[in-house]
Amino acid sequence: PLLFPLIGRLQDSQYTLDGRAWSISTHGFARDAQFQVSEQGPTALSFQLEDSEETRRVYPFSFVLTVTYTLTKAHRVENRSAVPMLYELGGHDGFRTPLEPGETMADYAVTISGVEELRPYGMDSRCMLTIGEARFPLEGGRIPLSPRAFGLDTIVLDLEGERRAALVDRSGRERVVVECPDFPYLGLWTADKPFDTGYFCIEPWSALPDAVFVG
């Protein structure tokens, strides 16, 4: 799914705009919306989502969101409102894990290029970001896919340098690579109950979710 116009949760599922409180669900509405095919070619496919009466009940802007899939993926957000439009955009792309018969998710880990020490944002039991960052002990430069590492929902990171993440197997071979030069944050997620779900999400984000210290 695609996260738009919100990434993560808001306190009380509300935001305030021009003195009015608006209610919107976790990750916004794009993940549940019906996109329309806008362009189709032999090697690419584009989908569009436009504002509607339903979206304007929770997000008072006129917009067009276009997503193009090839071997790469591109996003374009067009503001059709007469005022500046606030929005966030994030991926929620899941990749089959493990990739080979006989493997489990424990045979895989995530590496972040150019980062020697990971300091993910803290998160409370409601999956809201907390003040400051927590230090994450790396095992050989990797984040292991384990219930211990992902026991509290999502690992949220600042991306620096190459802004490149890879899913690697026990031999260190990169099996999935996600490059996101235009996204400053990264979310790493999989379901924790049960943990061995067969997929893992590497999610480029344009912004951070709401935090408990936001008043």
Locate the predicted segments by residue:
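Short, intrinsically disordered, charge-balanced linker/junction segments flanking boundaries
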Residues: 68-72, 211-215
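Active-site/ligand-binding surface loops and adjacent short beta/alpha elements
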Residues: 84-86, 94-181
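Acidic/His-leaning functional-site neighborhoods
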Residues: 22, 27, 32-39, 138-214
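Asparagine-centered strand-capping/turn motif at beta-strand->loop junctions
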Residues: 73-81
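Generic recognition of long tandem-repeat/solenoid scaffolds
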Residues: 44-50, 73, 165-169, 202
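Extended, loop-rich substrate-binding clefts of extracytoplasmic carbohydrate-active enzymes
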Residues: 18-71
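Hydrophobic small-molecule pocket/channel-lining residues, especially in calycin-type beta-barrels
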Residues: 7, 30, 40, 53-62, ...
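Acidic-aromatic substrate-binding/catalytic surfaces of carbohydrate-active enzymes
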Residues: 1-21
